[in-house]
A protein has these predicted regions:
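Glycine/serine-rich phosphate-binding loop and adjoining beta1-alpha1 elements at the start
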Residues: 1-104
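Glycine-rich phosphate/diphosphate-binding loop of Rossmann-like nucleotide-binding domains
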Residues: 76-175
Length: 175
């Protein structure tokens, strides 16, 4: 089953090969009400199915997964699948190098839903190795098109420039 709520990308709307719904997506509140109705209907007809939220925008992907994860069987491969496979690679790489995940500092090049999902899994895995979540989060940084996200970005926007090279050198993973 495929749920299409439209697109706000004008290039897609004008593209004759675009197969999606050629209208703007509704505002968030209206969109989520529509998804609520869809999820309720699917659960009524197929109560044991798993709903896969595929290719939603980053903030919507995270919000929808959080909204339904304790209500229905649901999954987002960008957030959960990519994160699970990548975390497995990190853990197995550390078996070769002899390190522990809790000792690593990780820099993400990108701060989308896949990166956020993986970062959350890394925090959880570091927790299983005895590291407190707030300490684990301090070992993770995200770098997007505007630079390093979080504390460093605020400093930069206030005028205290931090070079991207130094950010990468300080927070690069050692795996």
């Amino acid at each position: 089953m495929y749920l299409d709520a439209g697109t706000n990308n004008e290039t897609y709307v004008r593209d004759p090969l675009y197969v999606g719904l050629r209208q703007h997506r509704p505002p968030t509140e209206e969109l989520y009400a529509f998804v609520d109705e869809f999820v309720d209907a699917v659960q009524e007809v197929f109560p044991n199915c798993c709903i896969h939220f595929e290719d939603w925008t980053g903030s919507d992907a995270i919000a929808l997964l959080a909204r339904y994860r304790n209500k229905v069987s649901c999954y987002n491969d960008d957030i959960q699948g990519t994160g699970g496979v990548t975390l497995a690679g990190l853990i197995n790489g550390l078996k070769i190098t002899g390190g522990q995940l809790r000792e690593q500092r990780v820099l993400f090049l990108g701060a989308g839903s896949a990166a956020i999902g993986l970062a959350n899994l890394i925090v959880s895995a570091m927790g299983q190795e005895g590291l407190a979540p707030d300490v684990a989060r301090q070992q993770i940084r995200m770098f997007d098109t505007k630079g390093v996200c979080g504390e460093f970005r605020f400093r930069r926007e206030l005028g205290s420039e931090i070079s991207r090279y130094n950010a990468v050198a300080k927070y690069t993973t050692q795996v």
